[in-house]
């Protein structure tokens, strides 16, 4: 079940933004390989949850986008995973 925009805004970690039907955060790193290690770590979390984010890797940044395509928007699992990714960071 998707969450309303108000529910998402009320519960979204301050480090994340809502963009339409997705939540997004860009993580910044001192170097490329540290960002790659972070991607590996969050990929393991995503695989365990069987909920896979869209990840864009830059030179010293990693952008993560979460949504539930099957449900058609942002769900509880997206918010939970955002918090888990922040903990990993």
Model-derived regions, located:
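Long, contiguous binding/interaction regions
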Residues: 2-89
């Amino acid at each position: 079940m998707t969450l309303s925009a108000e529910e998402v805004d009320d519960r979204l970690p301050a480090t994340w933004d809502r963009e339409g039907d997705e939540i997004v955060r860009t993580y910044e790193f001192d170097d490329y390989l540290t960002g790659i290690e972070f991607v590996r770590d969050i990929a393991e979390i995503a695989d365990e949850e069987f909920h896979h984010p869209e990840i864009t890797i830059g030179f010293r940044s990693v952008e993560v986008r979460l949504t539930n395509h099957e449900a058609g928007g942002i769900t509880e699992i997206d918010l939970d995973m955002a918090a888990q990714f922040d903990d990993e960071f």
